[in-house]
Amino acid sequence: MWLKLFFLLLYFLVLFVLARFFEAIVWYETGIFATQLVDPVALSFKKLKTILECRGLGYSGLPEKKDVRELVEKSGDLMEGELYSALKEEEASESVSSTNFSGEMHFYELVEDTKDGIWLVQVIANDRSPLVGKIHWEKMVKKVSRFGIRTGTFNCSSDPRYCRRRGWVRSTLIMSVPQTSTSKGKVMLKEYSGRKIEVEHIFKWITAHAASRIKTIYNVEHLKEEWNKSDQYWVKIYLFANLDQPPAFFSALSIKFTGRVEFIFVNVENWNNKSYMTDIGIYNMPSYILRTPEGIYRYGNHTGEFISLQAMDSFLRSLQPEVNDLFVLSLVLVNLMAWMDLFITQGATIKRFVVLISTLGTYNSLLIISWLPVLGFLQLPYLDSFYEYSLRLLRYSNTTTLASWVRADWMFYSSHPALFLSTYLGHGLLIDYFEKKRRRSNNDEVNANNLEWLSSLWDWYTSYLFHPIASFQNFPVDSDWDEDPDLFLERLAFPDLWLHPLIPTDYIKNLPMWRFKCLGAQSEEEMSESSQDTENDSDSDNTDTFSSSKDVFEDKQNVHSSPGRTSRCDTEACSCANKCVSSPCERKRRSYGSHNTKEDMEPDWLTWPAGTLHCTECVVCLENFENGCLLMGLPCGHVFHQNCIVMWLAGGRHCCPVCRWPSYKKKQPYAQQQPLSNDAPS
């Protein structure tokens, strides 16, 4: 996860550098920056009308270019970036979809229940023609959609009862706007009553109703009262301009940010004394001033702060975000990070997509689960101080120059989605190249074949389904494993005629280990000293040792052949019993010339774990156990050299070499064996 987060941050850094590179190219070719001001006098009449269209100002009664230019200057400074965006949007001329309502419930859900936006609906009465023709309606839809106004058509033939109840007996236009200034308030429906059915007149009607919700100040005394007043709004944005009404984008934003930001329009058209505005720091007209508890911020002095709906919307969202905005941002970041798995994962193509789908599901599930306690926490009372400090931190960070660059880059890449996707793909391919190179240098094996990887995935799935891995520690000792219904499947899996289960080797570390010891055995140093002390008498000792060895061998044969004697090992329980004729402890004692008693040369069975079978030879290497060697036991009770059985199990043979019992599965322990005696029963 941290690797993917690092690559995502690296990708954002690449986008930031790439945007600065594009700015440098534009400056080199044209000699201008996006923040450079444009003189409206140098623009054509068509470009001036395009700017007014994007800002939402009517120009139908202004035939002269001079009047249009003055209206542009009164609404705000024009930058190169805003001019470029407006011309690009005009050239695109994409068709905007309009909603067709199917009935009362559909209309209620989208229009009356939507409390943070504006709807323009054309109602077509039964057996009547629409009020606005098809061509003019398409122009109307395109014009109002720039300001976030949604459109739709309600045909009364689909629900005549609802139209009669509403009083829609003739074709008309309906506009829905929030009724109060609080968030998620009631919605009121306004019906168009004008006589002229033209796009400009209808648009003026819409903007007039939207502007009526904005607090308007006409004199200095009212401005002083409002400027010094402290109310529930922490953020206020003022528009000081010489206009009849605020631009349409300003009115649309006031509805979108209802309850979060207060929009105030200061009409300075007939003001004679403007000294108070100088006292509060307003020197230029028009001015967009953001008033916060931290101070005054002049909108339009930084990169990307254009006089447009999209630019101011991103600016206000960064200062006063909703919980939904933060959730969408986290959702985008998490999914961008999850898609990095497509390039980090090496191997077959199907493997990449399987890992990608798994990562997407995991990350999105964790995101939703982590947001649930956050939403519960935000609903707790007495969190005003927490909200205040959080929003203050956002305002401090998002009014910096770096934040303005980030917002400008966000608007640039959101308007060029193909560039965003191509850079992401190129970044991912570079990650894939370096990751593949790193694995090759480390000699990591990668399944590049789809069939090979699918085969290994199927083996794993069938092994997990038919051969579940049991915990070595948690099985009860007193259970009857011979009556286990899974035993049949377990034993069928080990002959190579069926499945090759993929079993982890973690259970090996839990197997019992101990050292083989003999009764009365000395250390190696003591044995060496004893050997040096008896060096001069080696001839006589060798004779005695040979005689003693011969006697011991004869006694062994007698004990083994006697039907009344018990063997050193239980032959029914251990297949190693026939190997225990000569004790390794006895051989080691004889090699050093020891003359201990025969009882002292027996293996110390008390040090063996309970449930293990007594034997003195490893059936893997066919070597006897030496004093001090490391032993390891299996759940079935058989004992082997530790190195021998680990190599056996690590090779994929997860069963006992003697009885084929699964090496990871506990078995009902055998009865505790008693130390063996050489004395025959009477």
Swiss-Prot record:
It holds the Pfam family zf-RING_2. InterPro entries: RNF103, Znf_RING, Znf_RING/FYVE/PHD. It is a multi-pass membrane protein. It is found in: Endoplasmic reticulum membrane. The chain crosses the membrane at residues 6-26, 326-346, 366-386, 411-431. Pathway: Protein modification; protein ubiquitination. Keywords: Endoplasmic reticulum, Membrane, Metal-binding, Transferase, Transmembrane, Transmembrane helix, Ubl conjugation pathway, Zinc, Zinc-finger. It comes from the Eukaryota. It is an enzyme of class 2 (transferase). Its main location: endoplasmic reticulum. Expressed in different tissues including hippocampus, cerebral cortex, heart, kidney, spleen and lung. Expression is increased in hippocampus and frontal cortex after chronic treatment with antidepressants. Residues 525-542 have a biased composition (Acidic residues). A zinc finger (RING-type) spans 618-660. Disulfide bonds: none annotated. Residues 525-549 are annotated as: Disordered. One of its GO terms (cellular component) is endoplasmic reticulum. Interacts with DERL1 and VCP. This is E3 ubiquitin-protein ligase RNF103.
